[in-house]
Curated annotation (Swiss-Prot):
It is found in: Cytoplasm. NCBIfam families: PRK00110.1, PRK12378.1, YebC/PmpR family DNA-binding transcriptional regulator. The keyword DNA-binding applies. Keywords: Cytoplasm, DNA-binding, Transcription, Transcription regulation. InterPro entries: Integrase-like_N, TACO1_YebC-like_2nd/3rd_dom, TACO1_YebC_N, Transcrip_reg_TACO1-like, Transcrip_reg_TACO1-like_dom3, YebC-like. One of its GO terms (molecular function) is DNA binding. This is Probable transcriptional regulatory protein SACE_2018. It comes from Saccharopolyspora erythraea (strain ATCC 11635 / DSM 40517 / JCM 4748 / NBRC 13426 / NCIMB 8594 / NRRL 2338). The lineage of its organism: Bacteria, Bacillati, Actinomycetota, Actinomycetes, Pseudonocardiales. Disulfide bonds: none annotated.
Length: 250
């Protein structure tokens, strides 16, 4: 679990600095638009929209882009697309289970992109339900340490519903039930504790340990999937040790 989380944290730091930044912006803007359409355009009354806007800001998406996406979703401005959330399931190299979350206005295009990415990079598609049972939906909050101890964080969020705190090296990861995510985020804010993101993700209940070769193959598949315009998130049930992660990143 910790190896997977450290990899994801490192990957997203790099994504903010390289050519994938444009794709990341597009995904974050899409999240804002969909959140506004689903729960209304007022962030104070729509926690999902609030968190989508905060995440976009943290990743340096221009405020004007964020506001236009909010207005499109809320129907205050023309041009909003009919986005659909679709989950695809499959297997990656070494039998790793893969969940691909798409947000698309063209179901056939999304399915084709995901299938091509999987089959060309050592993966295969699976029937609905084949791997989804290996994952649980959880609220996940990431926050920089900023001199905070694990006890500092725990005392701030325990009564709000935090289930687990993981030390990821430079940051902490707080896990909650999805229904407690907003309360945990608000508890951090009440204590003046800065956080990087608060969102729901699919976390694996069982992980497949990978060596460096297996990790490289899987990371390539995930990178190709995430490069697809319709793909918002990719979840996989793998774990890598710190040593393997260092070898892969060397």
């Amino acid at each position: 679990m910790s190896g997977h989380s450290k990899w994801a944290t490192t990957k997203h730091k790099k994504a903010a600095l390289d050519a994938k930044r444009g794709k990341l912006f597009a995904k974050l803007i899409k999240n804002v638009e969909v959140a506004a359409r689903t729960g209304g355009g007022d962030p104070d009354g729509n926690p999902t929209l609030y968190d989508a806007i905060q995440k976009a800001r943290k990743n340096s998406v221009p405020q004007d882009n964020i506001e236009r996406a909010r207005k499109r979703g809320a129907g205050e401005e023309a041009g909003g697309a009919d986005w659909q959330t679709i989950m695809y399931e499959g297997y990656g190299p070494n039998g790793v289970a893969v969940l691909v979350e798409c947000l698309t206005d063209n179901r056939n295009r999304a399915a084709g992109e995901v299938r091509t990415a999987m089959t060309r990079n050592g993966g295969s598609m699976a029937d609905a339900g084949s791997v989804a049972y290996l994952f649980n939906r959880k609220g996940v909050v990431l926050l920089p340490k900023n001199g905070l101890s694990e006890d500092d964080v725990l005392s701030a969020v325990l009564e709000a519903g935090a289930e687990e705190i993981n030390d990821l090296g430079e940051s902490y990861e707080i896990l909650t039930e999805p229904s407690d995510l907003v309360d945990v985020r608000k508890a951090l804010q009440a204590e003046g504790i800065e956080y990087d993101s608060a969102e729901t993700n699919f976390l694996a209940s069982v992980n497949v340990p990978l060596d460096a070769d297996g990790a490289r193959k899987l990371f390539k598949l995930i990178d190709v999937l995430e490069d697809c315009d319709d793909v918002q998130n990719v979840f996989a049930n793998f774990d890598v040790s710190d040593e393997v992660l260092e070898e892969v990143n060397a």
